[in-house]
Amino acid sequence: MTLAASSSLYGAVQRRRNRGLLGLYIVVTAFLILYAVLFPGILSVGGFSKFTQNWFPLALVAMAQALLMLNGGITLAIGPMVSLGAVIAATTMGGPLGTFGGFLAVAAAGLCIGAATGAIVALLRLPAIIVTLAGSFIISGVALILLPRPGGFVPEWLSTLLAGHTPVAFLLLVLILGLWKLFLATPLGLGIYAAGDNPVGAYRSGVPIDRVKIVSFALSGLLAALAGLFVAAQTGSGDPIIGTPFTLNSIAAAVLGGVGFLGGKGTMRGAVCGSLLLSVMINVMFFLGFSPVAQYVAQGLIIVGAVAVPELLGRWRTNR
């Protein structure tokens, strides 16, 4: 894509990306205030660190899901990729590869599996939801082969660094968002939005649609695998099914953050805020004494509302 074509797309993409963010920020702030009232300990360094450690993996998988939703796709393999990342970390870091080698193995697995999935979707023109559903079974099977039951080893110093009493998780999240901002300034990064918003128009403008899709899947796999590594650091071991809840939670967080299913609508900031809102909602309902079943019902109703209200408002404005 040429610089001129990139510039011509930028204004429209920016406007579409930022719709509804102010309302989201207000809702998130209100929930954070309520949470601070119910649990004043979050205002301490230790409390804030513990909260961000619990939120961080959800933020990563929300970003992983948002990457594909912005491109007009979706993945059902987020949870298995989290599990596989945790398993690879726990089975390699205590061996000859060491901590750094284990980290590289986790990152390489996420990138390669994501890129392979993206290539199948892009080059064979298959629906992403079907390919990732099949992939989720394969990835889950590989995780169980590598580690049939919870176990393995994660260095204590790594667990202390990532899941100790310092806000390292929050700093890592800020770093990742900064890197995303830099990536978004490139033609390939802008192409993720353009291809999701209007694939035909993007193709005519010179956007390499297939390459954009493959890169989106690769980065999504990387983020999900790194979330698994962080979870392994939290627990000190690996678990082949620990990522199961993350698939649906990643979709819920992205939707709460205003990321559209049809592509091109939403922001990574929104997805992260959606994950924060979901995390805070779960904690608030816990402190208010909601039973687990009631929490699931409340989460479902809130997510349906998050999707339905903007749609109804849009129709009302159109018919007014």
Name each model-derived stretch.
Residues 1-33, 37, 177-179, 197, ...:
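Cytosolic-side transmembrane-helix boundaries in multi-pass membrane proteins
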Residues 224, 238-300:
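Transmembrane alpha-helical segments in multi-pass inner-membrane proteins
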Residues 124, 128-186, 212-215, 234-243, ...:
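Transmembrane helix-bundle core of multi-pass membrane transporters
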Residues 30, 35, 39, 161-195, ...:
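Alpha-helical transmembrane segments of multi-pass integral membrane proteins
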Residues 21-26, 51, 59, 80-84, ...:
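Hydrophobic alpha-helical transmembrane segments
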